[in-house]
Amino acid sequence: MDAVLLEHFPGGLDAFPSSYFDEDDFFTDQSSRDPLEDGDELLADEQAEVEFLSHQLHEYCYRDGACLLLQPAPPAAPLALAPPSSGGLGEPDDGGGGGYCCETGAPPGGFPYSPGSPPSCLAYPCAGAAVLSPGARLRGLSGAAAAAARRRRRVRSEAELQQLRQAANVRERRRMQSINDAFEGLRSHIPTLPYEKRLSKVDTLRLAIGYINFLSELVQADLPLRGGGAGGCGGPGGGGRLGGDSPGSQAQKVIICHRGTRSPSPSDPDYGLPPLAGHSLSWTDEKQLKEQNIIRTAKVWTPEDPRKLNSKSSFNNIENEPPFEFVS
């Protein structure tokens, strides 16, 4: 057996580390363990196994003075070696694990270098993923640097920050100016009291809601009385025809309360207030007005005075009270 082994392994068995062969287990008298321990002759499968080992050792090419030997095969084939890793030189498999790295400088009695055989190689356990080639190490460092660069925010200069603040201030001023212009337009369409200071936005919205509700109720109440003809809407101080000329139509008039038409009285809640400038929306049948005297009644919407917390919008029926500027 020694002759056969030396024929395939010129360097002898000394080149194998203790992790592959144990001297006590290899040379034993118990024939029940391994047929290689007999020493008389090798069986056919044992000879094939030795040839496979020799072929595998020569298959591991030695590059840059270092090579990678994988872990030994399962116990069923203790002397077989797995094929080389696809990870490249000095790189462990993706699955991790402790392979065997080998380097030059085998102990005396190792494999002599020859053109047909690899240089001497000393196997030792690798540290798994910790054993990386310089190329893999460089790739890892470059990836970490790129990730850090992506996370790093660009530091703006003081001039850039000042420009950003100025742009934000300009946008805010324009936004507030547009809101103020919209409220001014709303105030111009709502009959309000002559107040010594401009109405706030809350008061403007409250008056607008009350005025819109009043006009909506008035239109709903006038639907059964209106004719089929189209009418118009009077502007400030004027009136327009909204109903048809049917004989059964009733004269309707909308009067925005005009203060000061009645004699002032100290008991009047509106005493001392200047007259309210408003507009009148009126429509009636002109023929009926010419033929007979008609008593006109109308709903009156009085705007809420912001100075009076307890006052609310009121709806009154005023009889024979002329509007602010009545146009018959």
UniProtKB/Swiss-Prot annotation:
The keyword Transcription regulation applies. Gene3D superfamilies: Helix-loop-helix DNA-binding domain. Signal peptide: none annotated. It is found in: Nucleus; Cytoplasm. The keyword Ubl conjugation does not apply. PROSITE patterns: BHLH. Residues 163-215 form the bHLH domain. Pancreas-specific (at protein level). Loss of expression is seen in ductal type pancreas cancers. Residues 259-278, 305-328 are annotated as: Disordered. One of its GO terms (cellular component) is nucleus. Keywords: Cytoplasm, Developmental protein, Diabetes mellitus, Differentiation, DNA-binding, Neurogenesis, Nucleus, Transcription, Transcription regulation. Disulfide bonds: none annotated. One of its GO terms (molecular function) is RNA polymerase II transcription regulatory region sequence-specific DNA binding. Transmembrane segments: none annotated. GO terms for biological process: amacrine cell differentiation; cerebellum development; developmental process; exocrine pancreas development; neuron fate commitment; pancreas development; regulation of DNA-templated transcription; regulation of neural retina development. Transcription factor implicated in the cell fate determination in various organs. Binds to the E-box consensus sequence 5'-CANNTG-3'. Plays a role in early and late pancreas development and differentiation. Important for determining whether cells allocated to the pancreatic buds continue towards pancreatic organogenesis or revert back to duodenal fates. May be involved in the maintenance of exocrine pancreas-specific gene expression including ELA1 and amylase. Required for the formation of pancreatic acinar and ductal cells. Plays an important role in cerebellar development. Component of the pancreas transcription factor 1 complex (PTF1) which is composed of TCF3/p75, TCF12/p64 and PTF1A/p48. TCF3 is responsible for the nuclear import of the p48/p64 complex. Interacts with TCF3 and RBPSUH/RBP-Jkappa. An excellent marker of acinar cell differentiation in the pancreas. PANTHER family: BASIC HELIX-LOOP-HELIX TRANSCRIPTION FACTOR, TWIST, PANCREAS TRANSCRIPTION FACTOR 1 SUBUNIT ALPHA. It is linked to Pancreatic and cerebellar agenesis: A disease characterized by neonatal diabetes mellitus, cerebellar agenesis or hypoplasia, severe intrauterine growth retardation, the presence of very little subcutaneous fat, and dysmorphic facial features. This is Pancreas transcription factor 1 subunit alpha. It comes from Homo sapiens (Human).
